[in-house]
Regions:
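Hydrophobic ligand-binding cavity/cleft-lining segments
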Residues: 13, 19, 23-75
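Asparagine-rich low-complexity intrinsically disordered tracts
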Residues: 8-10
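Hydrophobic-ligand binding "helix-grip"
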Residues: 73, 85-134, 138-142
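Charge-dense, helix-prone N-terminal extensions
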Residues: 37-41, 48, 52, 68, ...
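Hydrophobic pocket/interface hotspot
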Residues: 57-58, 67, 82, 95, ...
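A conserved amphipathic terminal alpha-helix motif
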Residues: 140-167
Length: 167
């Protein structure tokens, strides 16, 4: 049953690649299909070094205007609900927690409320001695898609660094 559902979605995506405007849209769309809640996911974290202040970085991770600069084409928010737009598709996420200049955590709303593997989190750390700023991205991915998920985040964070002038 799951395999049939996956094959149907692969066929849909393959037939509609012209609508899915770029690789990022494809990978994000693929990762949040409903079938994904049926497949066990593995948590992973990636650390990126930034030449930016935690305050500025936080603005790009926590506000609709900041997120629309690098994460998606556009972002709307109403309270804790954020709607992310990529071309003709949109996905909703709930802001689970936000600690100024330190942490932002979102949960995709396509899954069950109690699903622990349906969130992504940004953690900002600053080394007290060197003052180096790091961003740690925590996400979940099916084991067989782990490398693609990491490549997606690498590409997204590269865009963020470019926006911040931190390349």
């Amino acid at each position: 049953m799951i395999c049939k559902y996956i094959k149907q979605n692969i066929l849909y995506i393959t037939n509609n690649l012209s609508i899915l405007q770029n690789d990022k849209v494809f990978l994000i769309y693929w990762r949040i299909l409903d079938y994904s809640k049926m497949i066990p996911k593995k948590q992973f974290s990636i650390e990126y070094v930034f030449q930016s202040s935690p305050q500025l970085l936080f603005q790009y991770l926590s506000t609709p205007s900041g997120l629309s600069e690098w994460f998606s084409d556009d972002v709307n928010s109403r309270g804790e609900k954020y709607t992310f737009f990529w071309g003709d598709s949109e996905e909703d996420a709930r802001l689970l927690s936000k600690k100024p200049y330190e942490k932002v955590k979102f949960q995709w709303m396509n899954g069950e409320e109690d699903e622990e593997d349906c969130y992504f989190e940004f953690t900002i750390q600053m080394d007290e001695i060197t003052k180096d700023v790091s961003l740690i991205v925590t996400d979940f991915s099916p084991e067989e898609e782990l490398e693609e998920s990491k490549l997606l985040w690498n590409s997204l964070i590269s865009d963020l660094k470019q926006v911040l002038g931190s390349t």
